[in-house]
């Protein structure tokens, strides 16, 4: 089996960016004159791409409508990250997929991560990092000695010294989502805690920094990284 498809979540509202950006969909905010999502499309360029659109989705659709490598999956009502994925999976035949947030970027060896996923016959692989200074808006992951995920806590107020941070990139077997219907649910809060109980879910730690565009300050940091 091989991985051929990547889902990118592009429905974020960017509520903390309202003073900075009132008109553009969050993933289209320009970083050094380039829409942020272009960095993700380059990272996952070897795969067929599905963009999950929601808030201001028509902007993303207009931008990529003529791109033959991109499938557009629109949510007509708010679905959350989990619902957006389930909605997109209805149009995807592949059994293995990559999923990425559309407003954050983490540089890592993607081929190595997919090799581990396939060789170990993992059901759900979360890319994680120990390269972070504060919790910010990221989920914390606790693993055992074999890197199997023991617990996941989205946006905790504190974390243990040994916890890892979720990078917002996942490799998964489609079947882990089989019991979920299209609804307003969260991948991080609703789905991941449940699949940890029933599937082989592992962390792949990459030691890389995560760059996101959640605040004006983080946008400046991302601009310096992508120069």
Indicate where each model-derived feature is located.
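Histidine-centered beta-alpha loop that forms part of the nucleotide-sugar donor binding/catalytic region
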Residues: 11, 54, 129-130
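Short acidic-glycine loop/turn motifs at beta-strand connectors
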Residues: 142-148
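Conserved N-terminal catalytic core of the sugar/cofactor nucleotidyltransferase
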Residues: 1-8, 30, 34-101, 105, ...
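Hydrophobic packing residues within well-ordered alpha-helices of enzyme cores
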Residues: 17, 60-64, 222
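Catalytic-core segments of class I nucleotidyltransferases/pyrophosphorylases
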Residues: 98, 105, 111-118, 132-133, ...
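Conserved beta-strand segments of alpha/beta enzyme cores
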Residues: 27, 48, 69-71, 148, ...
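N-terminal nucleotide-binding beta1-loop-alpha1 segment
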Residues: 1-22, 200
């Amino acid at each position: 089996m091989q991985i051929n498809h990547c889902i990118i979540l592009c429905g974020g509202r960017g509520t903390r960016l309202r003073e900075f950006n009132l008109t553009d969909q969050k993933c289209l905010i320009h970083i050094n004159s380039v829409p942020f999502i272009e960095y993700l499309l380059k990272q996952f360029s070897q795969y067929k791409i599905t963009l999950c659109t929601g808030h201001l989705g028509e902007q993303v659709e207009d931008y990529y409508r003529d791109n033959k490598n991109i499938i557009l999956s629109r949510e007509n009502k708010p679905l959350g990250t989990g619902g957006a994925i389930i909605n997109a999976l209805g149009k995807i035949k592949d059994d293995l997929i990559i999923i990425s947030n559309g407003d954050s970027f983490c540089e890592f060896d993607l081929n190595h991560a997919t090799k581990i996923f396939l060789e170990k016959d993992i059901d759900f692989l979360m890319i994680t990092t120990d390269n972070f200074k504060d919790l910010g808006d990221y989920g914390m992951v606790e693993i055992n000695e074999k890197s199997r995920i023991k617990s996941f806590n989205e946006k905790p107020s504190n974390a243990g010294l040994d916890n890892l941070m979720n990078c917002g990139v996942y490799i998964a077997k489609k079947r882990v989502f089989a019991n979920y219907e299209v609804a307003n649910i969260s991948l991080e809060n609703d789905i991941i805690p449940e699949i940890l109980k029933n599937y082989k879910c592992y962390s792949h730690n990459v030691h890389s920094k995560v760059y996101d565009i959640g605040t004006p300050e983080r946008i400046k940091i991302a601009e310096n990284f992508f120069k």
